[in-house]
From Swiss-Prot:
GO terms for molecular function: ITPase activity; metal ion binding; nucleotide binding; ribonucleoside triphosphate phosphatase activity. Its cofactor is Mg(2+); Mn(2+). InterPro entries: ITPase-like_fam, Non_canon_purine_NTPase, NTPase/PRRC1, YjjX_NTPase. This is Probable inosine/xanthosine triphosphatase. Belongs to the YjjX NTPase family. Homodimer.
Length: 177
């Protein structure tokens, strides 16, 4: 199956490939540019989810022979009086169905929080602080914070896996599409 992904980030592309493979689905991943209307640092759960959905629909519209369009969006949400970075994946299909999934979330480091809430991308702040180039295309800030135990790939893959759950044939009776 051809799967269009609204990103050129290798972490996201590999995560989509791996998530589909986990369920025995053969996916030919086709990267496309993300929509220009997306904010650099989405804040709020609805904004993050909307960004993932917009990416998924845009990818599907660009690649005419794709069965699925996938959007992966990382952003910040508030819970329990804290701010968390979360990854959300959305999968759109030709029937207009969109499924979503969340990856694990981690607390945004306090030293970055004010800038993040002003719209500065967490990855940019992490690159400056840790002196690493293109951190979001590599291990991500989570990779640095966990000393490589968890990577951005892991967060992306988990979100895509969760978005695939309603699409598994064994789960068809459980969902109304």
């Amino acid at each position: 199956m051809i799967v269009a992904v609204a990103s050129r980030n290798p972490n996201k592309l590999r995560a989509v490939q791996a998530a589909y493979k986990l369920f025995g689905m053969r996916a030919q991943v086709v990267p496309v540019e993300k929509p220009v209307s997306l904010p650099p640092q989405p804040i709020g759960v609805e904004t993050v989810v909307a960004g993932a959905i917009e990416r998924a629909r845009a990818a599907l519209s660009v690649v005419q022979n794709a069965e699925h369009g996938v959007g992966i969006e990382a952003g910040v949400l508030q819970a329990g009086g804290r701010y968390l970075d979360v990854t959300v994946a959305a999968i759109a299909d030709r029937n207009g169905v969109v499924t979503i999934g969340f990856g694990p979330a981690f607390q945004v480091p306090d030293i970055f929080l004010n800038d993040v809430l002003r719209g500065v991308e967490l990855g940019v702040l992490a690159e400056r602080y840790f002196g690493r180039v293109a951190i979001g295309y590599k291990e991500g800030i989570i990779g640095v914070l966990t000393k490589g135990v968890v990577s951005r790939f892991d967060l992306n893959m988990a979100a895509v896996v969760m978005a695939l759950v309603p699409r598994l044939s064994t789960n068809a009776p459980l969902y109304r599409f």
